[in-house]
Design a protein with these regions (language model features):
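Juxtamembrane/disordered regions of integral membrane proteins
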Residues: 14, 20, 54-55, 85, ...
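Hydrophobic ligand-binding cavity/cleft-lining segments
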Residues: 41-111
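Beta-strand/loop substructures that line and gate deep hydrophobic ligand-binding cavities in soluble
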Residues: 146-195
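Eukaryotic low-complexity, mixed-charge intrinsically disordered interaction/regulatory segments enriched
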Residues: 2-41
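Glycine-rich portal/gate segments that line the openings of hydrophobic small-molecule binding cavities
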Residues: 97-147
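Short, surface-exposed coil-to-beta transition loops
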Residues: 80, 123-127, 149-155
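Hydrophobic pocket/interface hotspot
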Residues: 92-93, 102, 130, 141, ...
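Short, highly charged C-terminal tails/helix-capping segments
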Residues: 197-203
Length: 203
């Protein structure tokens, strides 16, 4: 339930291991407590920030048997992000696959060979393998940061709208935990905002 990166971060931020948090909260938290009660207890009794009170509460609630948003039986922990922009889907796709576009979501790679089975790795350590290619529509691949224990599954869709605009949809599955889900939600939101600015107003 808790990935290695979350465990490292909670130790760094709070000075207490995740295993120690589980023991402490197991002694303090009632089984019928609401999410808000658990979060407020963590913040007030353990002197952690509101953000980390939220994370620890969400992660602990999974141990209590509660299922957080963004978790499914088949796809594990997942996140979906999308943005619509006033450009053609061909323009968006071509930019995504250019070295400039690739730098936004894979890193420094000279090119990406759009062939099923092609393996890639950027200088920053993002690596994976392409599993599905439908040019100017869909790309499916594995996607793993160098510090991750396991790869995620990434799908990128480029879709034309009825108004002549283009929606780019990103769906990422098999993330370690809901903490990483939020990290990646922020990452893809920022990536799409940057992509939109560069596609609509290129340098």
């Amino acid at each position: 339930m808790a990935g290695s990166i979350f465990k490292q971060e909670v130790m760094k931020v709070t000075g207490r291991s995740w295993e120690e948090w589980i023991v402490a909260l197991g002694q303090e938290v009632g089984p019928l407590w609401s999410h808000k009660q658990i979060r407020n207890h963590i913040v007030e009794q353990h002197q952690v920030s509101g953000e980390w009170g939220e994370w620890i509460a969400v992660m602990y609630e999974q141990i209590m048997g509660r299922v957080p948003v963004g978790v499914s039986k088949d796809a594990g922990v997942q996140i979906g992000v999308r943005k619509t922009m006033a450009v053609t889907k061909e323009r968006v796709w071509d930019f995504l696959m250019s070295s400039e576009g690739l730098s936004l979501w894979i890193g420094d790679v000279p090119s990406l060979e759009l062939q099923v089975g092609h393996e890639y790795e950027s200088k920053e350590g993002v690596s994976g393998k392409i599993t599905v290619v439908v040019p100017y529509h869909k790309l499916r691949l594995t996607w793993k940061r160098k510090e991750w224990d396991n790869p995620s599954r990434l799908q990128i869709y480029v879709l034309s709208t009825n108004t002549g605009k283009t929606t780019i949809a990103i769906h990422q599955e098999m993330l370690d935990d809901v903490y990483m889900r939020e990290i990646m939600r922020r990452y893809w939101d920022e990536m799409l905002t940057t992509l939109q600015s560069q596609v609509i107003a290129p340098k």
